[in-house]
Amino acid sequence: MTTLHFSGFPRVGAFRELKFAQEKYWRKEISEQELLAVAKDLREKNWKHQVAANADFVAVGDFTFYDHILDLQVATGAIPARFGFDSQNLSLEQFFQLARGNKDQFAIEMTKWFDTNYHYLVPEFHADTEFKANAKHYVQQLQEAQALGLKAKPTVVGPLTFLWVGKEKGAVEFDRLSLLPKLLPVYVEILTALVEAGAEWIQIDEPALAVDLPKEWVEAYKDVYATLSKVSAKILLSTYFGSVAEHAALLKALPVDGLHIDLVRAPEQLDAFADYDKVLSAGVIDGRNIWRANLNKVLETVEPLQAKLGDRLWISSSCSLLHTPFDLSVEEKLKANKPDLYSWLAFTLQKTQELRVLKAALNEGRDSVAEELAASQAAADSRANSSEIHRADVAKRLADLPANADQRKSPFADRIKAQQAWLNLPLLPTTNIGSFPQTTEIRQARSAFKKGELSAADYEAAMKKEIALVVEEQEKLDLDVLVHGEAERNDMVEYFGELLSGFAFTQYGWVQSYGSRCVKPPIIFGDVSRPEAMTVAWSTYAQSLTKRPMKGMLTGPVTILQWSFVRNDIPRSTVCKQIALALNDEVLDLEKAGIKVIQIDEPAIREGLPLKRADWDAYLNWAGESFRLSSAGCEDSTQIHTHMCYSEFNDILPAIAAMDADVITIETSRSDMELLTAFGEFQYPNDIGPGVYDIHSPRVPTEAEVEHLLRKAIEVVPVERLWVNPDCGLKTRGWKETLEQLQVMMNVTRKLRAELAK
């Protein structure tokens, strides 16, 4: 009989219950016990959904109050020593301080989890890091599930992936792989504690196997799993996000009891494991996208597998369902307005049912689920033949693009002269990245407007009032290039998606980005175009309030692509170029309206990189072309900015330079300007604004901290090409700390300008 299991589930709840409870706890509106009760209820509900799908195991250990890699830092005693906390007796309050910072310490650095839109907290490893086991997080969840009479499979990120996703810190140079001999016994203790608590199977996640690992890291898998296999539980080694076929010989030889492979991202890798002689878990339902599977096609893959493997075949989603929204059935508006599109979708709960149908078809025959299979086929056929998806005018515009359509009129050296002639900026010009605090009043006005409780005129007046406040406060602070604050925008991608054709939206399609932050990605289901101007009215209103230059603010094509659920029937590169041309219409309209500084945000450029380096060039070529297409045709005097965050650029700097933005602002404060060194060594040719303080924390930096970062920047970037700005947009901050943080930034800038003028 085929076994059905789950790798992981969304944590936040169908209606973001965890987010709201966390934020109430942080505001001291509920007690720790009340927060714990919400979490316990969510875990139980998740397990019940897995049971309802006829799962043989429920997943435990996947739930977290913030991030599963932070949980692992606590479980291994690898929390940063700079906090002075005891990992063996860490309070929930201290756990949150690790993630969010406190008055004495900045938060742990955050970056993207492989090529997803989820952020994890980056482990800080020092040459003298000591590890200490604390399995409480995993054991408690296992016992909770057992108390409900459930058969549970704990899931833990493996030791090599844990080291791989961390960073070396401290003055002493070392290779973090050298910490493995100290880390491994701690893993043995954690797994042993789970065995003693009754775990039969333990899933160990090693997504690092899907990237280009150095040879010594690959070799280390032999010793690691030889050691871990001595623990008396069965180990399911789980890989995902890409192919591990190149490691097939190694993986077949490892003394583990089962292997999970991602057959959605890399279906071709199945051939490499055709002769695998243990449990093979086939990840056949997409854990990262929202399209309904054609179950008949999936069965064409798994039925021959079952014939060969028998009871050794397990089925699951490709990866944790963390990356998908919770439940399609609550999307009543989408069902009413776009019934065809609704029928093509599957969220987490629908995916669990797809797996239930597959299990039944395999174990009891296709006839036992004939109705469900027919419905799946009908949805696939409807989507393949829909006229809602393909538009001849969009296809023609792309096909008719002339050669060099993506190039600016002149090189940067000429453009910057034309720009400075009218901008007349001082040394170390200051700006903001874009958004200002989204207050309760803003959110209430937007909600009331969407519900029809507030008229369009009243909504516009409310937003204009907020824009006027943002402009006034920036002028008081004496910033050089202003932003309008984006009060009218719910989300930097959703806002544009709502105004572009080919996009659709959900009401409750939230996925976790980090901690309590959730995003509701748009669905790109069809060809993309721009019916009318999207930002011109707001930007020109803001410009009318000030003599200082006002930045137009757009989200770039690659980021819109990366942060959406993208159609999977045409290449992503084609979708991206469609978005770029729609944005180009907006850029040229802004320019016509007198907005001559325009920022095209591309925070997601790096996360779009394929996991295998061999595939990078193709991606970077079409991503760069898409960015340039979005700003093509501008006058030399129009200054194009871009912003990138959560990123490491060292290995893609030529591609970043080839985007040819006049000014790039980047997130650097949490990494102590580490990123900037690469820009200096590469001699990045255009202007650059490294973030001088971390906006992800409410903490107000000291002037000494900001000065330290700015001086580091001056050492690396020629001062005439250096801008000063926060790390990122200020949407999630409160007004009080925002103004205090910006005041510190301005005080330091003035001090250094005076010094440089001498």
UniProtKB/Swiss-Prot annotation:
Question: Which sites bind 5-methyltetrahydropteroyltri-L-glutamate?
Answer: R16, E17, L18, K19, K112, R517, C518, W563, E607
Q: What keywords does the record list, in alphabetical order?
A: Amino-acid biosynthesis, Metal-binding, Methionine biosynthesis, Methyltransferase, Repeat, Transferase, Zinc
Q: Please report the organism this UniProt entry assigns to the protein.
A: Neisseria meningitidis serogroup B (strain ATCC BAA-335 / MC58)
Q: Which NCBIfam families match?
A: met_syn_B12ind, PRK05222.1
- Residues that bind Zn(2+): H643, C645, E667, C728
Q: What else is known?
A: Present in outer membrane vesicle formulations which are used as vaccines in human.
Residues that, per the record, bind L-methionine:
I433, G434, S435, E486, D601
Explain the purpose of this protein: Catalyzes the transfer of a methyl group from 5-methyltetrahydrofolate to homocysteine resulting in methionine formation.
Which Enzyme Commission numbers does its entry carry? Answer: 2.1.1.14
Give the EC class as a word. Answer: transferase
Q: Which reaction does it catalyse?
A: 5-methyltetrahydropteroyltri-L-glutamate + L-homocysteine = tetrahydropteroyltri-L-glutamate + L-methionine
Cofactor(s) required, per the database record: Zn(2+)
> Which GO terms of the molecular function aspect are on file?
5-methyltetrahydropteroyltriglutamate-homocysteine S-methyltransferase activity; zinc ion binding
Family (UniProt): Belongs to the vitamin-B12 independent methionine synthase family.
Which pathway, metabolic or otherwise, does it act in?
Answer: Amino-acid biosynthesis; L-methionine biosynthesis via de novo pathway; L-methionine from L-homocysteine (MetE route): step 1/1
Q: How is the cofactor bound?
A: Binds 1 zinc ion per subunit.
What is the protein name stated in its UniProt record? 5-methyltetrahydropteroyltriglutamate--homocysteine methyltransferase
Which residues does the record give as L-homocysteine binding sites? I433, G434, S435, E486, D601
InterPro entries listed in its UniProt record:
Cbl-indep_Met_Synth_N, Cobalamin-indep_Met_synthase, Met_Synth_C/arc, UROD/MetE-like_sf
Q: Catalytic center at which residues? A: H696
Q: What gene name does this entry carry?
A: metE
Q: Which HAMAP family match?
A: Meth_synth (MF_00172)
Question: Which top-level group of life is the source organism from?
Answer: Bacteria
Q: Which Pfam families does its entry note?
A: Meth_synt_1 (PF08267), Meth_synt_2 (PF01717)
Question: Upper taxonomic classification of the species?
Answer: Bacteria, Pseudomonadati, Pseudomonadota, Betaproteobacteria, Neisseriales
A single GO BP: methylation
